[in-house]
Amino acid sequence: MNFTAIDFETANSSRSSACSLGLVQVRDGIVTAEHVWLIDPRQRFDGMNIAIHGITPSMVQGQPTFEELWSTVEPLLQGEVVVAHNAAFDMSVLRYCLDASGNSYPDFQYLCTYLLGKKMLDELPSHKLNVISQHFGISLKHHDALDDARAAALILLKLMEQDQKCEPLLLADNQGYTAGKMFAGGYTPFKSPPKKAPRKKQPAKAPAFPPSAPSVKPYF
């Protein structure tokens, strides 16, 4: 049960505008380390984003840029199983920030608790982080990067317990998902295998009359 959960917050709609990163390490099913950083994105802050996470331009003044922070974060992700809620977003933020700073991608596999929750908790009206957290009784200050990362970690532990799987990758495989991968030069998404298209039925052939049969007019 070893994995690392992450969550990014952004200053605006650009995926390269990370302004906070939360990271939670789990070893043998127990949270063993938590980290949170404010990041100076060197970009504008949109009012809508500030309203969501509460991070303002003045709060990131003097904080490291992503490029400056990366040497600290990279060893915490390299070779890990990484987990995020709506991983498509967080992984795209990571890729965009790495591209913008000229850094190569680390090597790790990743899972998405949003998609796993959607598959395993289909009775819930929504599978947003706050809804699944409430379902499992997990305390959450939503859109705080550390709280969101911690909630994703605890949700994964609950899902593994529910599925009686002791490893994240076994859980994903058992639910029909392939782990996403990030590697030098590229990535693959966390996804379920494509559904096979149903075989088309061949149209039934009309029975042929014996050669000696008389012509018959159809009756409707």
Locate predicted features:
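Acidic, divalent-metal-coordinating active-site segment for phosphoryl/phosphodiester hydrolysis
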Residues: 145-159
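Conserved non-catalytic scaffold segment of RNase H-like nuclease domains
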Residues: 1-108, 122-123, 127-143
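Beta-strand segments within the central parallel beta-sheet cores of soluble alpha/beta enzyme folds
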Residues: 109-112, 171
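Acidic two-metal-ion nuclease catalytic site recognized across multiple nuclease folds
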Residues: 157-220
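Short, flexible loop segments at boundaries between secondary-structure elements
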Residues: 111-122
